[in-house]
């Protein structure tokens, strides 16, 4: 029997793209309540007044001349804005919410994933953790302590294609949106939690989700199916 206190909020760009179709088909197997937010691709120069810490020099333009160049673009702002909308949408009720990007795929069987969702919710109900990351950790992730059989206290996660937020902490998330300027979604979450002195729950040893292959709207280049965006661990 499916839980009635869990929902998925998925951030969408192009409902007809192959990677979004694959993602929906994967996530819909879970049988949870489902909300899709269509987040139009940003085509204007990104705002400078609310970039994180006033670092306007990090903004390189509407797009990157070189996809491998570092810098913030309209695509990054649009991605951040999409996550903010998803967070707000998740907080309209008391459901535990999985926020998923448009290309998120399950990497384990459905029942196993549901069991890990239950493990995350049990931690939420017995602790003050505000987020559980269902993405694969990268080589920069550091761990503090083991919290459950599979979840560790950690930080510095790269990529944001699947995470669960705790509805008890609505005010925390609103405060972070109001007080931490925009960045890439993953680094915005990293900064938001670090500056509040908070750790994240991380599935340390498990590869629960991955990203489907396709053209990245942020980098405007084709990306293969992958678990993490950082080189240095097995993809």
Regions found by a protein language model. Name each.
Residues 1-100, 104-235:
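An acidic/histidine-cluster motif and surrounding catalytic segment
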């Amino acid at each position: 029997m499916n839980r009635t206190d869990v929902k998925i909020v998925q951030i969408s760009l192009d409902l007809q793209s192959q990677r979004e179709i694959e993602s929906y088909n994967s996530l819909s197997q879970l049988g949870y309540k489902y909300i899709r937010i269509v987040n139009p691709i940003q085509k204007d120069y990104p705002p400078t007044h609310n970039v994180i810490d006033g670092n306007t020099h990090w903004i390189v333009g509407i797009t990157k001349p070189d996809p491998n160049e570092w810098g913030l673009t309209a695509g990054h702002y649009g991605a951040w804005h999409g996550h903010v909308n998803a967070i707000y949408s998740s907080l309209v009720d008391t459901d535990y919410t999985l926020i998923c990007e448009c290309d998120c795929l399950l990497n384990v069987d459905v029942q196993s994933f549901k069991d890990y969702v239950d493990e995350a919710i049990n931690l939420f109900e017995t602790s003050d953790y505000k987020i559980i990351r269902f993405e694969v950790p990268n080589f920069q992730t550091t761990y503090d302590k083991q919290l459950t059989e599979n979840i560790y206290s950690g930080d510095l996660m790269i990529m944001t294609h699947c995470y669960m937020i705790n509805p008890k902490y609505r005010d925390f998330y609103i405060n972070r949106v109001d007080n931490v300027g925009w960045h890439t979604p993953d680094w915005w979450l990293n900064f938001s939690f670090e500056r509040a002195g908070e750790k994240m729950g991380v599935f340390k040893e498990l590869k629960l989700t991955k990203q489907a292959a396709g053209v990245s709207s942020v980098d405007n280049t084709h990306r293969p199916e992958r678990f993490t965006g950082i080189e240095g661990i097995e993809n």
